[in-house]
Amino acid sequence: MAQLEGYYFSAALSCTFLVSCLLFSAFSRALREPYMDEIFHLPQAQRYCEGRFSLSQWDPMITTLPGLYLVSVGVVKPASWILGWSEHVVCSIGMLRFVNLLFSVGNFYLLYLLFRKIQPRNKASSSIQRILSTLTLAVFPTLYFFNFLYYTEAGSVFFTLFAYLMCLYGNHRTSALLGFCGFMFRQTNIIWAAFCAGHIIAQKCSEAWKTELQKKKEERLPPAKGPLSELRRVLQFLLMYSMSLKNLSMLFLLTWPYMLLLLAFFVFVVVNGGIVVGDRSSHEACLHFPQLFYFFSFTAFFSFPHLLSPTKVKTFLSLVWKRRVQFSVITLVSVFLVWKFTYVHKYLLADNRHYTFYVWKRVFQRHEIVKYLLVPAYMFAGWAVADSLKSKSIFWNLMFFVCLVASTVPQKLLEFRYFILPYIIYRLNMPLPPISRLVCELGCYAVVNFLTFYIFLNKTFQWSDSHDIQRFMW
């Protein structure tokens, strides 16, 4: 059975890589010059490729650290030595973009290993389900598209997933080192390094919580009634747990590599004067709470075969009626957050090359009341996401939610790329769906990818004040 699964995996990876190479060829023919953010990334990588590493050579418009450029040089330079290629060839636009295609292969393998580690291997979860889940996430439209451009997404996801995998296997020093590599690609990846530390803490809290519940059961104490009572009991437990010096010392011994990484991050923020390097004018942090609602909607859209069904809607409505007071409070809080904390970034309104421009224009700008009318949909999407993670412990869910808030809420710009990592982490930890739903999901992703690539490559346009060819993209 294991050998058969290996054949399935090899076939899926080979087919995906073949299709990716064909798409890469189409991209290379259509895009012979840097496009969008590549106008900053590619020249910087080429300067590094030429050995010009001084700070005076740094483009101040770049807001991320040089992880992508350093790894690219580490990949393409040995190729020039081994194959005898000229510097002009190995530092070309095509070769640098190809680095991300290599990252996509690594991401495919890491996703497969993570599914094998996270999902219990029993008769209920077949090898076909794991392979299909891996294939589906590997071609997840928002991530897959950026495998063909010189952006930080593919490498950022690679090192973050690698760090998560090492954490699950207990190699925490390696995990923290890989987390640092992820941070070098995108500063906000420090949150997912903290997520790895949180995973350990959640695991230990779950073990202690089970012991506590068993003790209460033996003492025949009444169980908690209702979610608020349960939450209060969990918070009391966490308070008591954190007051124990023995528990704190044990957690520190397990998480010290991550603590060192977080300390280094705080030193960086103090010395740098903020999390962003380079141009900070367009990357202002704020409390943009509706970003959570956008993420839940994004997740419901891309996971609709698993989250949307008449049964789920009926269950949700029944729960709303049963706990109408609690849901009324949640609704009022949500409306208040939408009212007071909705921000519209200047890029969202100015750049008509991104799909988010059209989502905002054709949905949110139709009428001022639309953003409030969407609150019930946000609530259903949030409940559906939480319900699909009920197999995880309450401590894991709390830790994931904290990291989700930290990675989305401070972002002023509505940008689907910011949702890639939290979505992948969510999808990895959701129980393996039935094969029929996975096939449906994969088919939908294939259609979305086809449309995205077709529109990007064929439906070009020009601005009135520029002769440059513009393209639609995520």
UniProtKB/Swiss-Prot annotation:
It catalyses: an alpha-D-Glc-(1->3)-alpha-D-Glc-(1->3)-alpha-D-Man-(1->2)-alpha-D-Man-(1->2)-alpha-D-Man-(1->3)-[alpha-D-Man-(1->2)-alpha-D-Man-(1->3)-[alpha-D-Man-(1->2)-alpha-D-Man-(1->6)]-alpha-D-Man-(1->6)]-beta-D-Man-(1->4)-beta-D-GlcNAc-(1->4)-alpha-D-GlcNAc-diphospho-di-trans,poly-cis-dolichol + a di-trans,poly-cis-dolichyl beta-D-glucosyl phosphate = a alpha-D-Glc-(1->2)-alpha-D-Glc-(1->3)-alpha-D-Glc-(1->3)-alpha-D-Man-(1->2)-alpha-D-Man-(1->2)-alpha-D-Man-(1->3)-[alpha-D-Man-(1->2)-alpha-D-Man-(1->3)-[alpha-D-Man-(1->2)-alpha-D-Man-(1->6)]-alpha-D-Man-(1->6)]-beta-D-Man-(1->4)-beta-D-GlcNAc-(1->4)-alpha-D-GlcNAc-diphospho-di-trans,poly-cis-dolichol + a di-trans,poly-cis-dolichyl phosphate + H(+). Residues 1-6, 86-97, 148-150, 197-256, 305-317, 387-392, 458-473 are cytoplasmic. Pathway: Protein modification; protein glycosylation. Its EC number is 2.4.1.256. The gene is Alg10b. Highly expressed in brain, skeletal muscle, uterus, small intestine and liver. Moderately expressed in lung and kidney. Weakly expressed in heart and stomach. Residues 28-64, 119-126, 172-175, 278-283, 339-365, 414-436 are extracellular. GO terms for molecular function: dolichyl pyrophosphate Glc2Man9GlcNAc2 alpha-1,2-glucosyltransferase activity. This is Dol-P-Glc:Glc(2)Man(9)GlcNAc(2)-PP-Dol alpha-1,2-glucosyltransferase. PANTHER family: ALPHA-1,2-GLUCOSYLTRANSFERASE ALG10, DOL-P-GLC:GLC(2)MAN(9)GLCNAC(2)-PP-DOL ALPHA-1,2-GLUCOSYLTRANSFERASE-RELATED. Belongs to the ALG10 glucosyltransferase family. Keywords: Endoplasmic reticulum, Glycosyltransferase, Membrane, Transferase, Transmembrane, Transmembrane helix. Dol-P-Glc:Glc(2)Man(9)GlcNAc(2)-PP-Dol alpha-1,2-glucosyltransferase that operates in the biosynthetic pathway of dolichol-linked oligosaccharides, the glycan precursors employed in protein asparagine (N)-glycosylation. The assembly of dolichol-linked oligosaccharides begins on the cytosolic side of the endoplasmic reticulum membrane and finishes in its lumen. The sequential addition of sugars to dolichol pyrophosphate produces dolichol-linked oligosaccharides containing fourteen sugars, including two GlcNAcs, nine mannoses and three glucoses. It is a multi-pass membrane protein. It is an enzyme of class 2 (transferase). InterPro entries: Alg10. It is found in: Endoplasmic reticulum membrane.
